[in-house]
Amino acid sequence: MERYDVVIVGGGPAGLAAALGARRAGAKTLLVEREARLGGILKQCIHDGFGLLRFGERLSGCEYAHRYIEMLRGCGAQTALLTFVSRIEKSGEGFVLTLVGREGLRKVEARALVLSTGCRERTARQVSIHGTRPAGVLTAGTAQHYINRMGEMPARRCMILGSGDIGLIMARRLTLEGAQVLGVYEAKPTPSGLSRNISQCLEDFGIPLYTSHTVTRVSGKERLERVTVAEVDARMRPIPGTEQELECDSLILSVGLIPENELAEALGVPLDARTKGPLCDQSYMTLVPGVFVCGNALHVNDLVDYVSESGEAAGAAAARYVPAACGLAEVSADGGFGYVVPQRIDTTKPAGKTTFFFRPLAERGKTRVRMLADGRELCKKTYMQLKPPEMERMVVDLSGAGLHAGSRLTFVMEEADT
């Protein structure tokens, strides 16, 4: 049986960075990817805006992935492409993975695992769209794959449900390719995507955005013929009498992303109900010792640069992993936060500057965020504005916090003085 220090599952941006981090820390590393090429979703992202933080340049997704692939080739990590992980079992102080690839079935042993499995898109059935099941109802990522990788046009007259970033980007992309985009319809009262994408993808191209609207029904036999849209109330329930029918041949869905964590759940990794990803500590180790997580499998990120940051940190931590007892301090947040990651601090690991990511639950003006350790204020930071679609990053020095097992770290939001 082949033995590795670290096995990484998923060869997208997080997995590439994790493999690089593990190899730089001296670990014998295997990166497992189910597709024929590394890069994950970046392979179909031909728009720019990637790499401003990591490389100080504005790159396309393909260029960003290529840079990491080239770095990976030079560091000596092994890769297994077109390979699925069908099973992971705990074995002694490590793990045994069953891999299915072109050469058949094989097993490998790992001292530590990094799960970088990314996320998947919600479908029409997950957001309760009723009606028939014609062709032409597809997720924004699928539409992007058709256009950017296959050179096929999936729509001529379409509408987009949901204002997530990929939906906004595809509204622009479809328009550039000659499709008529009737509008972007969002059930929430505010958009779900980044402000810059609202501006660059919709406003610059004259594409209307309808908030507090949703699709209630799709109609068509073999191909989509029309959709029914309606206004929604504060609880996002359709308002009777506001329905209208729109003729179109395609409905593009951008209604949210869900971290892929079937393997994590099979290993008994506890998940956070808010992020839908695993609970983890400051080294990205989950509550199952030796299992690390990073990227969109942990929580859905806005920027690939942050995905790579978590990947490199998780890979390096996995390379250093030695089975030992943990002393966990819990991280909690008041009602103003949607979530905070990481959710635990292992007090047996060296304390120092720790990066936290969070999203607010609702849009806020000038806001002060304070961090308390057992009731004592450690630090505070003032934000001019907070929006749920825009993830925030906060670095806190925990070296003088005096944390111990059972300590409690609390994030608090309060209105800042004007």
What residue spans do the PLM features occupy?
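A conserved FAD-binding loop/helix module that cradles the flavin
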Residues: 294-335
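Rossmann-like nucleotide/phosphate-binding core characteristic of flavoprotein oxidoreductases
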Residues: 1-5, 81, 319-418
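Beta1-alpha1 glycine-rich phosphate/pyrophosphate-binding loop at the start
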Residues: 4-67, 71, 145, 154-200, ...
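Hydrophobic alpha-helical scaffolding
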Residues: 55-58, 62, 188, 241, ...
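A Rossmann-like FAD-binding core segment of flavoenzymes
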Residues: 72-99, 175-262, 352-385
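FAD-binding core/adjacent interface of flavoenzyme oxidoreductases
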Residues: 1-9, 66-157, 233-241, 252, ...
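Predominantly flavin-linked oxidoreductase catalytic cores and closely associated redox partners
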Residues: 106, 112-209, 214-223, 297-302
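FAD-site-proximal beta/loop scaffold in flavoenzymes
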Residues: 115, 137-147, 250-301
